[in-house]
């Protein structure tokens, strides 16, 4: 006969302890730390809102549909993380930098590996009728020294607010994308289109969630950058168009004051706008 008094039964009050006690002694220490905290806060959430069976079923269905929306070009889980602010929080925790260094923001779900590498001054717009713009500036370290050989990976939406991978039958792959490398002076320059504001994909479960919360899905106009160099922390960031209507209500909380860039009209230039922006990279720890 089983001695029932020796069993550690699952109870509402002792749920956290019951689950965490099952963790094996050989569990990876970091995994143990993460899962112990996750169980603690997940159970606390369920107790705090007194989650119903119906609500839990809806949540499971939501996550299932979110998974079905993912493919090689679209990551609905990234969108979910973005709209609840988790992407920005994780990024903030992992990219603390000294004052004056360029700040990170969310990468977004539409970065594509393998974009063509161009000479400085090239135009990354393969097809489009948007407002033309020259993007330029320097890449320096925190002491003001130019960084030679910095890789600048850039991408943006079309004049209609869509990335190339969202319209494979309408835009050529790598439209409004390119890679550049700085010379000894740390300078960069390329041409493209002035970005426009756009809604994140809202035809899936994440868009439905925003609707239920009374939130719009729009992002302010921005150019994406990944700036990297040997010995320096990689910067994943945007430059935002100053004056955009959605700067104060970005659907993914990505706007930072230091990343808002002037887009200056250039009546005598070869493009309609000029968007100057300088990047400051922080040395890797130990460098």
Residue ranges and their predicted role:
Residues 2-287:
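Beta-strand-dominated extracellular/periplasmic modules and repeats
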